[in-house]
A protein has these predicted regions:
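Beta-strand/loop-dominated core regions that host nucleotide or nucleotide-derived cofactor-binding catalytic loops
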Residues: 1-234
Length: 234
């Protein structure tokens, strides 16, 4: 199933502010009720599972696959998170192509944190990552950058989807996925090399230097072991 709709961000929607705040840092969209009617009329098999649609620029044909939050958008309109519109060069009120797709369950994903030092300060970063991704990003595409909002601290963590398997677009909801981490964008190799200092200076800074030097090991092996994590259960 394919159709064209007018695309607007959540900032242009009449939805309640709580819903807008929840969805703007996700890849979930709002579609018109008429589309659900068409799917029901056709007795589409996908209704038994989660629905995913590729939102594409009609001229460049570049797009991203999104999940559906509700069928509550006005007739002829799709509401899309602004960060997805921006990555696809889609402006407010632009015609977009909406195409029903069925990505396979993923079995591997490699992630790259933009700000690993802040993320690793969370009490349980692995649990936070799994919970937010399964809630807000049920499907991911290799090469995209996602924005994870952690409401308890009101922080947004940017994460690159470096690699996915078995295909470039995968569903992560209820999937047993091996998670690996690429070197974070804020990783500074110079910080992990202990400088040559006098014995007195080394004594004064031993604890701090040791902490920094072992940061990458802690980040890779203890905070984010990345083996067979089940991302999502809803």
């Amino acid at each position: 199933m394919t159709m064209e709709l007018l695309c607007f961000s959540y900032a242009c929607s009449s939805q309640n502010p709580e819903m807008v705040e929840k969805l703007k840092h996700s890849n979930k969209i709002l579609l018109p009720e008429s589309l659900l009617f068409e799917l029901t009329k056709d007795n589409h098999d996908s209704l038994e599972n989660k629905l995913y649609f590729k939102v594409s620029h009609t001229e460049t044909e570049y797009g991203e696959v999104c999940g559906v939050h509700e069928f509550s958008a006005p007739p002829g309109v799709v509401h899309v998170p602004y960060h997805i519109m921006n990555s696809c060069s889609i402006g407010e009120g632009t015609n977009v192509k909406i195409e029903l797709v069925a990505p396979p369950k993923g079995d591997f994903v490699k992630l790259r944190l933009h700000n690993s030092k802040e993320f690793s300060k969370l009490s349980d970063p692995k649990a936070v990552l799994e919970k937010i991704m399964s809630q807000d990003y049920p499907v991911v595409t290799q090469g995209q950058t996602i924005a994870l909002h952690y409401p308890e601290l009101d922080k947004v963590f940017m994460i690159d989807i470096v690699e996915t398997q078995p295909t470039e677009i995968i569903e992560i909801l209820n999937a047993d996925i091996n998670v690996d981490f690429d070197i974070a964008l804020d990783y500074d190799e110079a910080e992990n090399t202990e400088p040559v200092e006098s014995n007195e200076s080394k004594s004064q800074t031993r604890d701090v230097s040791s902490s920094i030097a072992n940061y990458k090991l802690t980040y890779d092996m203890e905070r984010f072991p990345g083996k067979g994590n089940r991302l999502g259960s809803n």
